[in-house]
UniProtKB/Swiss-Prot annotation:
<feature type="binding site">
    <location>
        <position position="110"/>
    </location>
    <ligand>
        <name>S-adenosyl-L-methionine</name>
    </ligand>
</feature>
<dbReference type="GO" id="GO:0005829">
    <property type="term" value="C:cytosol"/>
</dbReference>
<feature type="binding site">
    <location>
        <position position="94"/>
    </location>
    <ligand>
        <name>S-adenosyl-L-methionine</name>
    </ligand>
</feature>
<keyword id="KW-0698">rRNA processing</keyword>
<dbReference type="InterPro" id="IPR020596">
    <property type="entry name" value="rRNA_Ade_Mease_Trfase_CS"/>
</dbReference>
<protein>
    <recommendedName>
        <fullName>Ribosomal RNA small subunit methyltransferase A</fullName>
        <ecNumber>2.1.1.182</ecNumber>
    </recommendedName>
</protein>
<dbReference type="InterPro" id="IPR011530">
    <property type="entry name" value="rRNA_adenine_dimethylase"/>
</dbReference>
<dbReference type="Pfam" id="PF00398">
    <property type="entry name" value="RrnaAD"/>
</dbReference>
<feature type="binding site">
    <location>
        <position position="69"/>
    </location>
    <ligand>
        <name>S-adenosyl-L-methionine</name>
    </ligand>
</feature>
<keyword id="KW-0808">Transferase</keyword>
<feature type="binding site">
    <location>
        <position position="48"/>
    </location>
    <ligand>
        <name>S-adenosyl-L-methionine</name>
    </ligand>
</feature>
<keyword id="KW-0694">RNA-binding</keyword>
<dbReference type="GO" id="GO:0052908">
    <property type="term" value="F:16S rRNA (adenine(1518)-N(6)/adenine(1519)-N(6))-dimethyltransferase activity"/>
</dbReference>
<keyword id="KW-0963">Cytoplasm</keyword>
<comment type="similarity">
    <text>Belongs to the class I-like SAM-binding methyltransferase superfamily. rRNA adenine N(6)-methyltransferase family. RsmA subfamily.</text>
</comment>
<keyword id="KW-0949">S-adenosyl-L-methionine</keyword>
<dbReference type="InterPro" id="IPR001737">
    <property type="entry name" value="KsgA/Erm"/>
</dbReference>
Length: 260
């Protein structure tokens, strides 16, 4: 049965405020799952199960699947599609408020468009060892962007600091119900052995990108004494991830020393 048929069967009305766009092409779901290369020993977290197209393919691998879905009106569809699989657990809750996500799991998801930024931060916070996520094409470009590119910014830096990033493939808007206005991109993120305080780090990155066209000297004005001898004439968008981490460490150490 097609995704659109399931929606009609159970009279599900799409909720605009949730940005609901459901993957309807089984071939894309299979391609994503193949790229994940899952084993029965893996624990997989899916954010936004939707109508279950990707969820069903994930369960077929034998991995333990924990699927989050905020919209309980989709429960009948998900239960019909997944009832024969003992290795899937449905959690009807907001992933952004989740408290017991297993650390070191693998995230495989079609990320809800309206909360992509916060969800990417949660992926970092929960320390997923790998994440294969489908996002809006424009968001994918920002995640993958290199220094000097117009799309390089806060999201590029925070994701690339903690993950090796790689583009897998693009997905046409025609593969979704309803058809969104933009195409999507699937990206592969592999966790780096980085030990940084994410809350402090994202605060620093937000600060240096606060006014993107301004130089570091402008954006770091309250902390100029910390960076004495450092060239602050460039803009944040011109710095590599490694250079930003180096500046952050200098800032963090100085603040810790000042607090005793």
């Amino acid at each position: 049965m097609k995704t659109s048929d399931y929606l009609k069967k159970y009279g599900v009305r799409l909720k605009k405020h949730l940005g609901q766009v459901f993957l309807s092409d089984d071939r894309i779901a299979k391609r994503i799952v193949k790229a994940a290369d899952l084993t029965p020993e893996d624990v997989v977290v899916e954010i936004g199960a939707g109508a279950g197209t990707l969820t069903e393919e994930l369960t077929k691998t034998g991995a333990r699947v924990i699927a989050y879905e905020i919209d309980e009106s989709l429960a009948p569809i998900l239960q019909e599609r997944l009832s024969k699989y003992p290795n899937v657990e449905l959690r009807f809750e907001d992933f952004l408020k989740a408290k017991d996500v297993p650390e070191g799991a693998i995230c495989v998801s079609n990320i809800p468009y309206n909360i992509t930024g916060p969800l990417m931060e949660k992926i970092i916070e929960w320390k997923f060892k790998r994440a294969i996520v489908m996002v809006q094409k424009e968001v994918g470009e920002r995640i993958l962007a290199k220094p000097g590119k117009k799309t390089y910014g806060y999201l590029s830096v925070v994701v690339q600091t903690f993950y090796e990033v790689k583009k897998l493939f693009d997905v046409s808007r025609s593969c979704f119900v309803p058809n969104p206005e933009v195409d999507s991109t699937v990206v592969d993120l592999k966790r780096k052995p980085v030990d940084l305080d994410f809350e402090k780090f994202k605060k620093f990155v937000s600060m240096i990108f606060a006014k993107k066209r301004k130089t570091l000297k402008n954006n770091l004005k309250p902390f100029l004494s910390i960076f004495e001898g450092v060239d602050l004439s460039r803009r944040a968008e011109q710095l590599t991830v490694e250079e930003i981490v180096e500046l952050y460490e200098k800032w963090r150490r100085a603040l810790e020393c000042s607090r005793g």
